[in-house]
């Protein structure tokens, strides 16, 4: 019997666990799953005979090493900052590893050691990154095999709320880490390539300079640029590609509303504001409106927004005009106060379903003519456990686990799923899930 060690069984692991257990008898697997929330973990394992629940500090190398040593494959669903430590343990113990997260510079530096240990460390095998890579590379390789020249590649993905559960004017609810949403785009300019030229898009313009796209049967979405698109030129073997843009999808008017919050300063996370025990959202908002006259907060905000004053209902809906609610935090950054409000306004309800939308656009030249291919994927969650995010992250990880254990994937070292021998069988099986 082959042992699979799963470190972390949180939000995105439900579908992964189900797949591993559903296939465990036929594949002769035993799943050892680890999470500090033992009750939640046992609920997900459902008393399956091929599953064993463990509750210990998976962040402690000395504690987890004995479990890694007994495993044939390790899957880390821990926060991304802990993957390198797990990878170092796997190299020392010569155990294969899968993570759904981006390859960090520290992880990439382990490539030679992983190859020397004869193991694969598979990263970026979730949805974004993951399915986006695989679905893109399939089409890129097809274009190249036709003797055509790729001119432009744009790729967008977004974790959103399903239309049936869309009940607010922002058309958004938290389906992922709220803090990551509030701080999205901060820290450095977005970099992409357009018509052969590098473009830098600073944070204060990120949600202004957006692109609208349409997905069949789901309408219009708006995309803002991700942090670094040009790193994927090498990843995809497209160093000479004139245009590459990767971005995140939202539903209008989200980007316009979020841009207004940025311009006000409400997403700032570099300084704190004291709460004397009476600090309300209305007071927070008034702090950032640059007018000293006696007009109401609403009137001053309308003046600040100018031609975008029609965004006022968005501010009202998330509670920024509220003069009764008192913030719980005693001291916080503007972004943290904003997050406290948004976690109330954008909380996923018990019957809400999430939605994952992915869109690719390829423009290529063949025989003197330009052609365009559009490719899209929409996944809608089943319920609060088997969400669209859980499905689209968990299934690729699970299928990759099977392929590694069955030695279908032979590649060693630190890698990602941009190679045919990896993406073809994974995409083929994913198609069975729609």
Predicted regions and their residues:
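Hydrophobic/small residue at the entry helix of a nucleotide-binding pocket
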Residues: 12
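Helix N-cap at the beta1-alpha1 junction of Rossmann-like dinucleotide-binding domains, i.e.
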Residues: 36-40, 104
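Rossmann-fold cofactor-recognition segment
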Residues: 47-60
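Conserved Rossmann-fold cofactor-binding substructure of NAD(P)-dependent oxidoreductases
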Residues: 58-69
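N-terminal Rossmann-like NAD(P) cofactor-binding module of classical short-chain dehydrogenase/reductase
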Residues: 72-76, 97-99
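ADP-ribose/adenylate-binding Rossmann-like module
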Residues: 89-107
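Rossmann-fold NAD(P)-binding glycine/threonine-rich loop
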Residues: 101-123
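C-terminal catalytic/substrate-binding lobe primarily of soluble NAD(P)-dependent oxidoreductases
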Residues: 145-434
